[in-house]
Amino acid sequence: MAGFTYATLTTAIQNYTEVDTNVLTATITDQFIDNAEMRILRDIPLDAYKKQSIGNLVTGQNTINVPAKTLFVKGVQVYTSTTAATGANTWLEKKDESFLQEYVPSTESTKRAIPKYYAMFGGATGITDTTSGTLLLSPTPDNTYEFKIHYEAIPTGLSGSNTTTYVSQYFGNGL
């Protein structure tokens, strides 16, 4: 099946439902399209939207913001280096927030070490890095280690102003 543009997909939806734009308004059609795209993105992690974000942990701070427009976090690496995201590193294990709070319940300096675990909480609107959620780390970092977040990004959806997307071109039958 060939891919869709915004215009061809909205026409196909109207033809399938046998109603015109007086009943099936652009607002309703756009919501159908958005829901279908999000379902595809959640169910099929696409290489086209794999992203990485690199930064430095803050000594004594056990949270970091998830990058803006994150659909979900695939993994977190912490490097033993404080200056480069290369070399020796550890993949953090995802756990529930309650596990992390029991594992090391304190952020005091004697309990700090290179993190081993992370948990997701809060946010989840995906609009900015302060509303995309937060990662809780345990134990709390004892140094400014370099970290890399591997995540699936939320792409710009199909719309009247964005007439084609990777999903509309290669997963048209899912829409």
Please provide the spans of the model-predicted regions.
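Glycine-enriched, solvent-exposed interface loops adjoining structured elements
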Residues: 1-175
